């Protein structure tokens, strides 16, 4: 699928909603939609046939599926089931390709007829769905000159970048790189209590992951002397004053538009106090801009522009005792650094008036153009830096790169391809519309990127693994392609032997005398199966070299007992639970990670940290360390059969 259609599986949800009033199904949509449909809607054999479906069918598997469907479609009486099957075919690249292949369609004429009828019936809905999908795509046009643009990305070095920051970073990078522009990465280091040099290194690493490597680096602290001078200038203009009103009282007064008792303070007295603040001797005072306490825009009600803070700064040490607020420093440094385009989240929109008040009243020559955009919100995702910091600092998670966190480093360890992330974020454009995004859409693009370049391996769950004896083979090794459709990935050495392991789940499915397929090997026939207390303990099988894998229902992954390697497979979930409490400790989801141990084929020892692979019939995994793998979200596959 291309960038505009990778979410087409949502078509099934759209049809079910419009025609049958059904609520949206979670991905995989087709599978969950089928589960929710009443079983009496399915003629005999159809459920098993649909079980062989996968979004990533090979050509031979696609033909097999359509041929199998051909023998059953005329018995389907339910329009809802027909529509689900229509959606399954319509959103599957391989199946739609086969439906247009004149040589192949002769093998499944009834399937083609059913599909054609449903296509005609659903044509109006298809048009609506596709039109809606186009509207959802953002654009990157803001009506500003595209040449010599200078943008800035100003992160605070008090944590790592999360996916929300990624949008701001990439939009600033995009507009700067369009035509001879420049991007400035400026660390907003105005709060020495929270900021550390290690976070600067981490943020630069995050930007590198996003592919942002060309920029000019600066710090707000580079301009502290100039910013302080401008604070003094504002006092001299009668447009700033020192204030020792208690914080809670000040908050209440600003909310009600009540002027501070300090607002009429003499200019020289404010200068004297500000000088003492700069020495760290005026505890309890701040400096406020004198703007308009009656303004309907609360951002204009005499905002604080300097605070005393005696904590040592990670760059300037104890040189300064007074620090500017972000709202005061930002327009100053934007102007001084020659920024032409200031891209900001629209949550700051009420501060735009304040931003330009500072530019104008400080008589700064360069006046950047502000363009704001909506934040990206994601379902069940914590983007509050305060909450993330709490869980990191208190040991609930392993660090800022924990896979449960939506930080750039965290989702990298979940197997996110950064090119896919860039593509998705830029596809949202500079929209003003705030919306909540489902992660499955992002991971759908990710799968499109990783699937063609991920090597394939087998693994079997250790718990109650079934020992299988093969009575007509010997031990040997053979080189097998790591990916049948991508020879560039090379080969792996597979060890074949008379003693292999199957998962308990697969062992239970196989019946006595059943012919099944051992993937990457051939067909085999079950000779005997030993079951103790409901658990399959061992099996005996014979290889059938003349068997046709196209005729077997069950295709099983396996590993040789000798040479198998134990791997840790981790599945990460949501960071927080649904408890109705403000206590972050109680909100932590203590079931947010599940770890299991599996036997993997011996070639797995060659997989290096950072690689993404597929354990076939299981899911895609990110190698998080030697023999440690993290499941990529929305890639877990059905185990039994197929």
Swiss-Prot record:
Binding site for ATP: 162, 347, 382-386
Top-level class of the enzyme under EC nomenclature: ligase
Major site of localization recorded for this protein: cytoplasm
Residues binding L-glutamate: 152-154, 188, 326-330, 344
UniProt short sequence motif 'HIGH' region, positions renumbered to this chain: 157-166
InterPro entries linked: aa-tRNA-synth_I_CS, Gln/Glu-tRNA_Ligase, Glu-tRNA-synth_arc/euk, Glu/Gln-tRNA-synth, Glu/Gln-tRNA-synth_Ib_cat-dom, Glu/Gln-tRNA-synth_Ib_codon-bd, Glu_tRNA_lig_a-bdl, Rbsml_bL25/Gln-tRNA_synth_N
EC number: 6.1.1.17
CDD domains per record: GlnRS_core (cd00807)
Motif segment ('KMSKS' region): 382-386
Keyword Transport on entry: no
Signal peptide: none
Catalysed reactions, semicolon-separated: tRNA(Glu) + L-glutamate + ATP = L-glutamyl-tRNA(Glu) + AMP + diphosphate
Protein's cellular compartments: Cytoplasm
Family: Belongs to the class-I aminoacyl-tRNA synthetase family. Glutamate--tRNA ligase type 2 subfamily.
Protein's name according to its UniProt entry: Probable glutamate--tRNA ligase, cytoplasmic
A cellular-component GO term for this protein: cytosol
HAMAP family: Glu_tRNA_synth_type2
Domain of life: Eukaryota
Transmembrane parts of this sequence: none
Keyword Magnesium: no
GO biological process: glutamyl-tRNA aminoacylation
